Amino acid sequence: MSVVNFYGQLSNTQQFDQIRINIASPDQVRSWSFGEVTKPETINYRTFKPEKDGLFCARIFGPVKDYECLCGKYKRMKNRGITCEKCGVEVTVSRVRRERMGHIELAAPVAHIWFLKSLPSRISTLLDMTMRDVEKILYFENYVVVDPGLSILQKGELLTEEELQKAKDKYGEDAFTASIGAEVIQQMLKELDFSKLKQELYEELQTTSSEVKKKKLVKRLKLVENFLESENKPEWMIMDVLPVIPPEIRPLVMLDGGRFATSDLNELYRRVINRNNRLKKLIESKAPDIIVRNEKRMLQEAVDALFDNGRRGRAAKNANKRPFKSLSDMLKGKQGRFRQNLLGKRVDYSGRSVIVVGPELKLHQCGLPKKMALELFKPFIYSKLELYGIATTIKAAKRMVEAEKSEVWDVLEEVIREHPVLLNRAPTLHRLGIQAFEPLLIEGKAIQLHPLVCAAFNADFDGDQMAVHIPLSIEAQLEARVFMMSTNNILSPANGRPIIVPDKDIVLGLYYLTLAFDNEVGAGMMFSDLAEMEHALYNKFITIHTKIKYRRNQLNAEGKMVPVIIDTTYGRLMVGELLPSNPNIEFKCINKQLTKKDISLVIDLVYRHCGQKATVIFADQLMKLGFKYACSSGISFGMDDMVVPESKSTHINETQLEIKEFEQQYSNGLITYGEKYNKVVDAWSRCTDRVANDMMKEIATPPVNDAPNHQKINAIYMMAISGARGSFQQIKQLGGMRGLMTKSNGQIIQTPIISNFKEGLTEFECFNSANGMRKGQIDTALKTASSGYLTRKLVDVAQDCIITEKDCGTDKGIEVKSVIEGGEVIVPLAEKILGRTAAIDIFHPVTNDLILNKGELINEAKLEQIESAGFDRIMIKSVLTCESTTGICSICYGRDLATGTLVSEGEAIGVIAAQSIGEPGTQLTMRTFHIGGAATKGAEVSSVDASYDAKVKIISRNVVINSEERKIVMSRNCELLLLDNNGNEKARHKIPYGARLLVDDGDMVIKTQKLAEWDPYTIPIITEKSGKVLFKDMVEGISIRDVTDEATGIPSKVIIESKQYSRGAELRPRIQLLDAKGEVITLSNGLEARYYLPVGAVLSVEDGVQISVGDIIARIPKESTTTKDITGGLPRVAELVEARRPKDHAVIAEIDGRVEFGKDYKSKRRIIIHPIDETMSIEYMVPKGKHVVVNEGDFVKKGDLLIDGNPVLQDILKVMGVEVLANYIVNEVQAVYRLQGVKIDDKHIEVIIRQMLQKVEVTDSGGTTLLVGEKIDRHEFDEINEKAMKNGLKPAEAQLILQGITKASLQTRSFISAASFQETTRVLTEAAIAGKVDKLRGLKENVIVGRLVPAGTGYFMDKMRKAAAKLDEENV
């Protein structure tokens, strides 16, 4: 026997490549078993020894103590392998009690509840019965006809007890066979001939036309094919023998006081054994049928409870009325086997303690309490003590450590040197939540943390705790040092910006240090070296803020030192001294008042040009400098620093007058209540902003008096402007006015809070503000959970996304352009393409020089070239178009944001993407507008101004001139472009229907010139011709109603939803225009002038009046159209990645064509689009009350909205394709994060979208075995098609489908990963029937089977292992 096998078998976890799951056959169960369990007893309560043949029997499951049989005849190692003849126990290690199984021979067959009740029920699908019927047979309620024989009964017909008796009386006892219970189901399953059944189903599928029937057939056919492929037998779903899991896995523990705590499984097994034994006795003693049947039913129920308690009927409960935990419950949920023990293990060699700040640490260090280090590094200390001969044995070493002798501390110092430890702060939302540091031993009991890493850990020192873990093996230490050291994690993987950035007081100190004042002592002095300046400072000739001239040596591009004279201050020079010398880093980047943003940019610059080491040193020194001056400046603030502006009362009075006017308009019936509400809220928003701006001006300009200069600047202003603490939002509430508050449902209360915190709130205001504050508090508590859940879903869907090759060689890419909203460039092109790779060769548009090769990385240098060339769009490679079969290639992904270089193979980009999107999720409030409940609703946009001097170009211009000689836009998709001198687009504005155009095509405009204006609160309906108004289908009280406003008593005519009219005709309220002869006027597009009015429209004209071109005949109040709920923050992100249908979604035109309104149907309107080439027209049925944004006769383009709202993602994919869809999702998700000022790189969102687009739906099966409507993995589909084409068959056709992330996770190729995510039982049931094979490609499945993950270093281990296996095969 080899030495290796001496202590039992080595774990063979490394030996397999894939795992397969199947239904166990009865013979297999018997082969696993070491004996039959026949007695329900567990252990003898007097001797505490396991009972023979019971649930803990030592003969079946193995000895209780190592190498000792039960009766004690054989003890110790020498008797290994002997089976005791007295008690029948094999002498071996007690560990076998964790792996040996037993079995129970059932007296009657029993159905496995998973295959019966897990939807869709497999047993009933195969037998083509309903689940209800199968249950009736199994639970002995009805008989089923197995063989109709001579009767006219149908095979498979159900009969009750009475019906059976009648049939027997009618046809005779033996004329037919009917039976009951699991036996008959087993027999029916056995009789199924799958190959024949498959053929029949195929034929039926070809002939049937009913969709419902097709779906049912496809389902059944799929199941039949699964059984054929997996070689499972259907009768195995009914069990004759039940496995008993090893006793150590369902332990029985003795508590103090002689009582026992037992696993629920033992209780459930006992019930099964008891009922089984009773059934055996009843059968032997030939008991009456009805009693036997009842016992069989009870046995079935007992086995059901064991497998999945509570799935059917009432759950079996214990004495405390708590349901038993069955086998299924052991796997399910957060506390189940998968998530509790396989994915989340407790870690040895770890400790946790409170953290305190360690400002004198270096960036790569942390302070570790001595006591803690002694405990954590014990094994290392023991070995060192023994090695040096200080202790003779391990035991002696242990005693020394316990006595804390002085030698021990010396050894500890040595052990700890250069041995990194991992620090982790829960919740670990992204990979920077665990970082490695070199420990320094400190007194006390708290861990010291470097201030600069707080941002990454999201830590503060108000009592946070952190955990310490020790990497033991040399490999682990190496990985900790190379990958996880805090100095190697300077850039954030989410956006590639530095995350080691000074914060809070450091920023304040640096801001104070770099201030410059005009009339300070010694202004304008000249200096040539720092020592001289220090001398002057010490003797009070200058201050740190004095503006002086200084001669500084600067590196030029050739690397020579060149003296330059600069205007600066002593404070700025101190920061300048820390800058590494590099020609690209000029003094001017810090020669200004440094805010947090500036500091971040400087650190980024240093990292890009001088590398990591220089950055770390620079950041560390910057921190020390910042702390020093934050301390010596003594900045603090008092009541007088909160300035209330003089102009506050005037602004408030003006606004109150304005609001009186709105009230007047409302009482005169000129505007609706909703419009009044909008206008009031808007007016107050504007007022608040004005007061705030005035206050800011006052704070920013120091008062002119004789106080020494550096006390002039306002402390609160300094804190906010430098980015150290607080925001202008908060200052506004301190000194301006608090403004509008939101109700708990997100509505804005019309009366604002006029006071600020300095003046104090009135009782009424205080009560009003409590509302919003309470909502904020509750939100915070609730949102954390939903954010965590979103992160978990994202990680799960993307966890197998790994970089597997350098280049997939695809020619595809996506086109990106800058994001423009409201004519402003929000995200410039440069930001979107940095760190991506070019999909094609890119040439300069003027000189035609090659700027970028295909597949070349776009770095900062290339970016400058692209920007100067003036591109407005660029083709880049993307993970969406990557063609790697497993994983993704480096070139399509581009730059690894955490390192700034091309991503390396083995990087787990999926998890990084999920973390990058999920981590800021916790910062996203549910609703996006509270600062202490204050509403920050932006005023509605009601006009467009030119942002540049430019030339106007108007797209789809359709204008009428109204009676006031104004140009009124009549087009639904009018866009106004501003072009520069070269004709490049600088800005693009959407001009709404009904707006007044103030410029025309080809005009030259100057900056800030108004281009167009409109009423933001209503959508008008405007006439294109003059004529006389004729009302049609406007029946008082049925389709139109005089709505009298209760506040004003003024009636206005409003269109209401018309119920079915008495004569059954549908009413379609409309206004027609008649000419002088009384005939309907024809419009320019050849249609009659009639305007359909949606529900809620308010009429602006009377019947029979004369109107002119461009007049408003009705208006739709905006509030009824903006039911586009502002699903803010996280719910919107979740809605997008789950691909849900938005509430009140938009309808998209699928083709280009002309719009026509067809005949209405019930409560739906029919919109028809006729394509230009007069092929098939497309019809849409839309609910009547919805506002249709097109008119009859309008020409729409593919992808235009017919009805307002958020479009359905699946529609975008179907109509516009993948690229447009991806673009839409990326922009929508980014919009949510942008509101919060969170930056995430697009590529992370693209990775998630790629995972949502994994499946295709078969539309034509061709010559393959695929079924129409089947959903299958893209790559599998391609493989099947390749095979078909090789064999000369017609390939199948399919279309891409978009799945939400939950669905995509549950349908991954790996069943282990899917089972550990959600719906464990359903996933495992499906996998077992199909005999699925898990190739162990993703991270999760490998963690579960206990291997290194195939990412990072594990990726190469995996690659080498596979290569080695291949070589072995070849050699053999």
From Swiss-Prot:
One GO MF term attached to the UniProt entry: DNA-directed RNA polymerase activity
EC number: 2.7.7.6
UniProt-recorded name of the protein: DNA-directed RNA polymerase subunit beta'
Cofactor note: Binds 1 Mg(2+) ion per subunit.
Binding site for Zn(2+) 2: 808, 882, 889, 892
UniProt keyword terms in alphabetical order: DNA-directed RNA polymerase, Magnesium, Metal-binding, Nucleotidyltransferase, Transcription, Transferase, Zinc
Family, as annotated: Belongs to the RNA polymerase beta' chain family.
Its job: DNA-dependent RNA polymerase catalyzes the transcription of DNA into RNA using the four ribonucleoside triphosphates as substrates.
Subunit structure: The RNAP catalytic core consists of 2 alpha, 1 beta, 1 beta' and 1 omega subunit. When a sigma factor is associated with the core the holoenzyme is formed, which can initiate transcription.
Catalysed reactions, as listed in the record: RNA(n) + a ribonucleoside 5'-triphosphate = RNA(n+1) + diphosphate
CDD domains the record matches: RNAP_beta'_C (cd02655), RNAP_beta'_N (cd01609)
Segments crossing the lipid bilayer: none
Organism: Rickettsia conorii (strain ATCC VR-613 / Malish 7)
HAMAP family per UniProt: RNApol_bact_RpoC
Cofactor(s) required, per the database record: Mg(2+); Zn(2+)
